[in-house]
């Protein structure tokens, strides 16, 4: 134990040897070869990115003209349309509110298009979101909402939401029931070594540090995010030691991705240019928002409005071409990317390490030193360096970005937009409805209060004259006080049911009209599901109970009436674009679930010892698993025993 402790400390404090990994092979970067996916991870599981020779004349950074999508994303969505339309038609035919519609004219290339956004919130979000996706999955038993996952075109995730979507993406989009029992594992916590842990045996700390040192030794700057990413990946990837060489771009090889069988996955993060604000990891609401797919790192914001292949992240570019003909692969490690989207846990990682064993306390002191030296964000070699005029075409990349060597990327929810809905508002994606699953810990006892939607609303309505984004409109939403006082955060709520009553004004509905938002908050249907943000150990039985709570909350205890009303929300924009009236049945649904504009801004006392908002468990039983309060009690007792 003591030998291991000193060895681990020595590893952390050792000076990294910086070098360059050379490869004699010529790695073609032509646009044709972008379509050739990177290989699956090999058994040589090194975390170090690989430097290869490549053609320095190839353009690898492309501007994104307004009205267009990145080329391979567009190809994916074109392929996705037929799969999604077939699933959506089946869903709508089964609901009494939409079965009588002429679905052949409503469902098609012109819509409806669906998006899913899973909020941040650590394990709380991953497990509630997992239950929600299970509820939307046609492969799940006893769900009234089955088929909506198969109908969706996009899925976004930030923080814990990115853990969820990445876990699905790298594991062939297996069912939540399967993946939660075979891969998700939290009982030992994230930085603990009491038992055998995913092939680490008793060398957990040593392995994590060795892996990060491999990256440093290859000549790349490392940060707290590298350690955090290596730790969290062990809990959702399903590969030995969390897949040290598993890349996000390798998802292109997955059969589900090649056939576009499930939604296009986007990890959402934010960029800070010009360094961190003094004493803060936050950002202004007009900072750049980046999204990472298996194909591209993209930003639609006007100060970037460009995209570059995910496969070659880490490459040093100058004006869109690789410097000295050297390209980097394997920088886009899945753990590193989702760690980037959840960097707020970097600070918690330090705190946990300082509170644990003597060995982990030493880890904490070392990581805290990294924080003091400015390594609390994630370092991405800037692909937009000097990218002012690529191939004779002027770019939109701003001077403060082209002049910096690194993109400082960090948590996708730091500006308050904890529901990663922004990428789904881009007019180019033509989405009609967004399911927004909110597991934010807004209140003192970690329940959502709508603040995430309010932050997006303010980003749009308080748009400065020099705003860096094109999204100009959003649905109207009330204050967090109204969310709580009217119970909008305790039940599903539809926002923007009338497409002519958004921030865009009373104008005809078209694809520039913001999508209707179906707000689905984390609520205690079968158990108290308000896990604290920095809880790291969860019993396997509690994982299943939390997933079941998300399932029941999403289906409203398998309510057929709610499922029929959700069908109304899905087709609403398509009907409005055609000037078709809403049916009487759907009007009744909207009167029940749509926010009608009522406000109640009475201050909400958020005393953590006696909070005003402290919802009770709604039901003692649920369809499918028949979870009950007694089970929750035993799960809690078991968790306390494990964590004692």
UniProtKB/Swiss-Prot annotation:
Glycosylation sites noted in the Swiss-Prot or TrEMBL record: 44, 96, 141, 178, 221, 245, 253, 281, 286, 316, 319, 373, 393, 449, 501, 558, 579, 596
Signal sequence, start to end: 1-19
Enzyme class: hydrolase
EC number of this enzyme: 3.1.1.5
Keyword Signal tagged: yes
Annotated keywords: Glycoprotein, Hydrolase, Lipid degradation, Lipid metabolism, Secreted, Signal
Location in or out of the cell: Secreted
Alphabetical GO biological process terms: glycerophospholipid catabolic process
Reactions this protein catalyses: a 1-acyl-sn-glycero-3-phosphocholine + H2O = sn-glycerol 3-phosphocholine + a fatty acid + H(+)
One Pfam family matching this protein: PLA2_B
Main function: Catalyzes the release of fatty acids from lysophospholipids.
Protein name: Probable lysophospholipase 2
Higher taxonomy: Eukaryota, Fungi, Dikarya, Ascomycota, Taphrinomycotina
Gene: plb2
């Amino acid at each position: 134990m003591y030998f291991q402790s000193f060895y681990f400390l020595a590893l952390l404090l050792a000076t990294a040897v910086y070098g360059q990994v050379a490869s004699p092979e010529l790695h073609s970067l032509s646009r044709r070869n972008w379509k050739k996916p990177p290989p699956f991870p090999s058994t040589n599981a090194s975390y170090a990115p690989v430097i290869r020779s490549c053609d320095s004349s190839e353009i690898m950074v492309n501007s994104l003209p307004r009205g267009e999508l990145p080329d391979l994303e567009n190809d994916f969505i074109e392929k996705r349309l037929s799969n999604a339309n077939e699933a959506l038609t089946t869903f709508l035919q089964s609901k009494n509110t939409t079965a009588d519609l002429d679905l052949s004219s409503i469902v098609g290339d012109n819509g409806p298009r669906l998006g899913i956004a899973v909020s941040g919130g650590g394990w709380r979000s991953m497990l509630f979101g997992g239950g929600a996706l299970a509820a939307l999955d046609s492969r799940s038993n006893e769900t009234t909402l089955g088929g909506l996952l198969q109908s969706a075109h996009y899925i976004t995730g930030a923080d814990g939401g990115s853990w969820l979507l990445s876990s699905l993406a790298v594991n062939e989009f297996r069912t939540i029931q399967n993946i939660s029992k075979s891969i998700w594992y939290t009982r030992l916590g994230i930085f603990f070594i009491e038992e055998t842990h995913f092939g680490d045996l008793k060398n957990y700390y040593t392995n994590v540090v060795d892996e990060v040192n491999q990256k440093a030794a290859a000549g790349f700057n490392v940060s707290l995010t590298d350690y955090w990413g290596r730790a969290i990946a062990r809990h959702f990837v399903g590969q030995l030691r969390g897949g040290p060489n598993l890349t996000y771009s390798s998802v292109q090889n997955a059969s589900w991705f090649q056939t576009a069988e499930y939604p296009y996955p986007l990890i959402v993060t934010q960029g800070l240019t010009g360094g961190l604000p003094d004493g803060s990891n936050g950002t202004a609401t007009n900072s750049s928002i980046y999204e990472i797919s298996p194909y591209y790192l993209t930003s639609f914001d006007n100060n970037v409005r460009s995209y570059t292949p995910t496969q070659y992240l880490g490459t040093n570019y100058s004006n869109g071409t690789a410097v000295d003909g050297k390209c980097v692969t394997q920088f886009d490690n899945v753990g590193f990317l989702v760690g980037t989207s959840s960097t707020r846990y970097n600070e918690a990682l330090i705190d946990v390490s300082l509170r644990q064993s003597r060995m982990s306390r030493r880890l904490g002191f070392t990581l805290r030193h990294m924080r003091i030296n400015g390594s609390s964000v994630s370092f991405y070699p800037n692909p937009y360096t000097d990218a002012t005029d690529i191939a004779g075409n002027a770019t939109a990349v701003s001077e403060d970005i082209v002049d910096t060597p690194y993109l400082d990327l960090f948590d996708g929810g730091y500006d308050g937009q904890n529901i990663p809905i922004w990428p789904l508002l881009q007019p180019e994606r033509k989405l009609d409805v967004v399911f927004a699953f909110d597991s934010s810990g807004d209140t003192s006892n970690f329940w959502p209060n709508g603040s995430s939607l309010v932050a997006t609303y303010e980003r749009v309505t308080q748009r400065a004259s020099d705003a860096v984004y094109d999204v100009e409109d959003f649905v109207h939403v009330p204050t967090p006080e109204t969310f709580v006082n009217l119970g909008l955060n305790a039940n599903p709520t539809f926002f923007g049911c009338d497409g002519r009553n958004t921030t865009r004004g009373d104008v005809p509905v078209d694809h520039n009209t913001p999508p209707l938002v179906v707000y689905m908050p984390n609520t205690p249907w079968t158990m108290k599901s308000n896990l604290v943000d920095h809880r790291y150990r969860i019993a396997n039985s509690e994982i299943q109970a939390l997933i079941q709570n998300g399932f029941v909350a999403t289906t409203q205890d398998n309510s057929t009436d709610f499922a029929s009303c959700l069908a109304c929300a899905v087709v609403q924009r398509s009907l409005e674009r055609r000037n078709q009236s809403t049916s009487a049945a759907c009007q009744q649904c909207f009167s029940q679930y749509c926010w009608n504009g009522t406000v109640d801004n009475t201050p909400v006392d958020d005393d953590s010892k006696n909070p005003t908002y402290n919802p009770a468990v709604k039901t003692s039983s649920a369809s499918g698993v028949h979870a009950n309060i007694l089970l929750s009690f035993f799960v809690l007792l078991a968790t306390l025993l494990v964590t004692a």
